[in-house]
Amino acid sequence: MSLGTTDILQKPIAAHAHYVQSQSTDDVWKWVLDSRGKVTTTFVDVLNTSPGQVKEVIRFDVDNRNMGEAATFKTPQRTFKSVNSITKTSFKEFTFGQEVTGEFGVPYFKKLGVKLTAGQKFGENNSTLESTETTTQYGGDSITVPANKHYAIDYVFTTTNFSGKFQNKREIPGTSNIRVAGFWDPDTGTQRRSEKFLNEKTKYGVVKNLQIAYDELKNNPDQGNLFHDELLSRKNIKIHLGFTNGDDYYLKPEEVKEKILDRVYLDDDKKKVYVLEDAAEFNGQSGIDLSIKVIDRTNNTEKELPKILLF
């Protein structure tokens, strides 16, 4: 995102101060939200897991329909090879930050034997992040099939599919607070303010107040129902956000959400605020579970039988 100072109504009055009146969300980032720190943290979030996904079914038929008496059959012993894989599905370059974290994601990857390291880089076309092969032995099971019966033994291999995101986030210190919020219509000169935010303090500072301001201006009828169709039909309507550092911003309502709130994340545990810098999606498969089914196929139908028949 550009940090230019477009649509400036009043330039900073001194080199050591930056009192700004602006209609640009870029200036909100530049003067209020931009981080003084340089640390980027990569958050590893496993968002979805789907265990029990059938990877393959290997069937052995044990047909005793042509025999007049019961017969014992034994399946051959074999090995099944599978791959635990993690694939970056976003076709763009992605580099991990100086720190890697994720309450569930990092331990999940560690369980798979995957080490995520700071500064790790994946090219645009380097989609496979990790791949390990596992071997599972199966077979060697015996079953007695009655005369004139047709059974099958199915070896069912299932895996866990998962997906998630790598997200690079940069911490924003919440040092400024909104002193006033309202709306301004440059066509009519109408300006309306809410004193609700005057000297209001929250554990997150400015960013939390931005969310409060946006919700308040959107939903509170006492503020003239600012998002009402009639009001929004005035194409130049602006949300006014005034900060305690002296800055005043007059922003389009949709820009407050799309360019600010949708890129800001609050960490309740660490009591920190982050801005999203980059992200990449991933998916993968992990682990193999083996189950065995005994199927009666005698009458051109399939009926599952108790596994106790195996020995």
Swiss-Prot record:
It comes from the Bacteria. Keywords: Plasmid. CDD domains: PFM_epsilon-toxin-like. InterPro entries: Aerolysin-like (IPR004991). It holds the Pfam family ETX_MTX2. This is Uncharacterized protein pXO2-60/BXB0074/GBAA_pXO2_0074. It comes from Bacillus anthracis.
